[in-house]
Amino acid sequence: MAASVANCCFSVLNASVKIQSSSISSPWCFVSASSLTPRASSNIKRKSSRSDSPSPILNPEKNYPGRVRDESSNPPQKMAFKAFGSPKKEKKESLSDFSRDQQTDPAKIHDASFLNAVVKVYCTHTAPDYSLPWQKQRQFTSTGSAFMIGDGKLLTNAHCVEHDTQVKVKRRGDDRKYVAKVLVRGVDCDIALLSVESEDFWKGAEPLRLGHLPRLQDSVTVVGYPLGGDTISVTKGVVSRIEVTSYAHGSSDLLGIQIDAAINPGNSGGPAFNDQGECIGVAFQVYRSEETENIGYVIPTTVVSHFLTDYERNGKYTGYPCLGVLLQKLENPALRECLKVPTNEGVLVRRVEPTSDASKVLKEGDVIVSFDDLHVGCEGTVPFRSSERIAFRYLISQKFAGDIAEIGIIRAGEHKKVQVVLRPRVHLVPYHIDGGQPSYIIVAGLVFTPLSEPLIEEECEDTIGLKLLTKARYSVARFRGEQIVILSQVLANEVNIGYEDMNNQQVLKFNGIPIRNIHHLAHLIDMCKDKYLVFEFEDNYVAVLEREASNSASLCILKDYGIPSERSADLLEPYVDPIDDTQALDQGIGDSPVSNLEIGFDGLVWA
């Protein structure tokens, strides 16, 4: 899949690439607006040691956004995510208060004192090594931006400070760097909150206030430190579109603002302004293809305010909730007549996630016709402002985890209303492991770990195999805490002769017991008193180890391969059974694959 790649090498999350149609001849992808040095880009993605055919180094689908390895021998080009500042208040204010309206002189956008609020973020990243989960990858550095929102806080993109080990910030016109701390990351909305303790950093700074959602064709100004120079850059354009948009970093779908102002590598994290000098959002990604140009995306202030309110309410970020249903449009008259839907409205429930609260009140075949008394059209849209419509999922995104929604449905021709508690989606294969190391356990050289999107990306899709990829893309969790556990690799030793070539295979059972997650597997192994350890894999493959011989070989294997522990720290904790429904295991993983928006099927969509 081709994508426009500059010398700085745009970086793209694998989950951000969307296939628009069955034809691969019209490629397009979302990329984060961050810059990379030419030399750093060649090293940013280390190949798997077991990969027979290394992937192209500059393939944007195999790189993480916003990361630049520091090369002292070849000074990196500046990579910018911009930031605005606000003074540290003596009187503590609510973070959500900064969404209040504040009229600003339009000329102030070009005033030096206003631009001084923009700061540059310097981040050192140390990402986990998902192929060798007991260690981390070599550290690298990146630069970005953030803007001050008051009370000693900075706002930036989550991908700017992902897997951070050190964060520093520097104001415009200042040669000093100040240590910053990441307070919270919202991966799904690509927003992070930083704090700076130094009083000197905040001298002369003014807080930035958030404005309203703009209108179509409103002027917009994007400020930042993009590639091409060290000083601040200002670009202008107009609002082209406002709709539910795919967020590349979080693999989520939230409200987004499309603009035609140039957003280049380095603009991530920088504010976008209207003509009144109000911040209407945060620049975070661009849309690249051979047929388009100047399509940038801004996180609107409604999403920013939701993030801040969530953090303020809970003391942590709980994430955006979902309804947990797969929906189909009802545009066909015969389909509506068959379902006894009298009017041109509603969307059909095709599947309900077992882990969602909707599974208690909604059924396949129900037609959702309203959400909190707002009518849902047959195309899955609801009224939005004057003379506009927007995807039904927008209403769900306005809720918080734990909120209750009233759903109007038609079931077998009968109108009903049900209440559903909205909770964050449970991913069978997580898109991110934010903080900490991946879980793993090593048994006689057999390395077991949960399947995750970062692992798939690191291993390359070709080495993962079609079956695992299908489950990762299409399957849903049957219960909270469920994982797909795989045998990642085998560390060769005489105790595991004959199994050395096994890798990336799903383990289904241990001594006849179905595996629920990696912690469950570790628990079963610890409790085992049988003579043999029997692992059953996909495709009916089996591996048998003698228990006492395996235990005796463990220390030798760890020493030979320089591994500090046979398991990750989280697996040392007592095991808690995640299943609250004993019938959940009767349903096979992946037996009923479903589609999702990223695959490009326009008729079915998760909400």
Swiss-Prot record:
<dbReference type="GO" id="GO:0010206">
    <property type="term" value="P:photosystem II repair"/>
</dbReference>
<dbReference type="InterPro" id="IPR036034">
    <property type="entry name" value="PDZ_sf"/>
</dbReference>
<dbReference type="GO" id="GO:0009941">
    <property type="term" value="C:chloroplast envelope"/>
</dbReference>
<feature type="active site" description="Charge relay system">
    <location>
        <position position="159"/>
    </location>
</feature>
<keyword id="KW-0934">Plastid</keyword>
<keyword id="KW-0720">Serine protease</keyword>
<dbReference type="GO" id="GO:0009658">
    <property type="term" value="P:chloroplast organization"/>
</dbReference>
<dbReference type="GO" id="GO:0009507">
    <property type="term" value="C:chloroplast"/>
</dbReference>
<dbReference type="InterPro" id="IPR009003">
    <property type="entry name" value="Peptidase_S1_PA"/>
</dbReference>
<dbReference type="GO" id="GO:0009535">
    <property type="term" value="C:chloroplast thylakoid membrane"/>
</dbReference>
<dbReference type="GO" id="GO:0005829">
    <property type="term" value="C:cytosol"/>
</dbReference>
<keyword id="KW-0645">Protease</keyword>
<feature type="region of interest" description="Serine protease">
    <location>
        <begin position="118"/>
        <end position="317"/>
    </location>
</feature>
<protein>
    <recommendedName>
        <fullName>Protease Do-like 2, chloroplastic</fullName>
        <ecNumber>3.4.21.-</ecNumber>
    </recommendedName>
</protein>
<dbReference type="InterPro" id="IPR043504">
    <property type="entry name" value="Peptidase_S1_PA_chymotrypsin"/>
</dbReference>
<dbReference type="Pfam" id="PF17815">
    <property type="entry name" value="PDZ_3"/>
</dbReference>
<keyword id="KW-0472">Membrane</keyword>
<dbReference type="InterPro" id="IPR041517">
    <property type="entry name" value="DEGP_PDZ"/>
</dbReference>
<feature type="active site" description="Charge relay system">
    <location>
        <position position="268"/>
    </location>
</feature>
<feature type="compositionally biased region" description="Basic and acidic residues">
    <location>
        <begin position="87"/>
        <end position="104"/>
    </location>
</feature>
<keyword id="KW-0150">Chloroplast</keyword>
<feature type="domain" description="PDZ">
    <location>
        <begin position="308"/>
        <end position="403"/>
    </location>
</feature>
<dbReference type="Pfam" id="PF13365">
    <property type="entry name" value="Trypsin_2"/>
</dbReference>
<dbReference type="GO" id="GO:0004252">
    <property type="term" value="F:serine-type endopeptidase activity"/>
</dbReference>
<keyword id="KW-0378">Hydrolase</keyword>
<dbReference type="GO" id="GO:0030163">
    <property type="term" value="P:protein catabolic process"/>
</dbReference>
<dbReference type="GO" id="GO:0009570">
    <property type="term" value="C:chloroplast stroma"/>
</dbReference>
<dbReference type="GO" id="GO:0006508">
    <property type="term" value="P:proteolysis"/>
</dbReference>
<dbReference type="InterPro" id="IPR046449">
    <property type="entry name" value="DEGP_PDZ_sf"/>
</dbReference>
<dbReference type="GO" id="GO:0009533">
    <property type="term" value="C:chloroplast stromal thylakoid"/>
</dbReference>
<feature type="region of interest" description="Disordered">
    <location>
        <begin position="41"/>
        <end position="104"/>
    </location>
</feature>
<keyword id="KW-0793">Thylakoid</keyword>
<keyword id="KW-0809">Transit peptide</keyword>
<comment type="function">
    <text>Serine protease that performs the primary cleavage of the photodamaged D1 protein in plant photosystem II.</text>
</comment>
<dbReference type="InterPro" id="IPR001940">
    <property type="entry name" value="Peptidase_S1C"/>
</dbReference>
<feature type="active site" description="Charge relay system">
    <location>
        <position position="190"/>
    </location>
</feature>
<comment type="similarity">
    <text>Belongs to the peptidase S1C family.</text>
</comment>
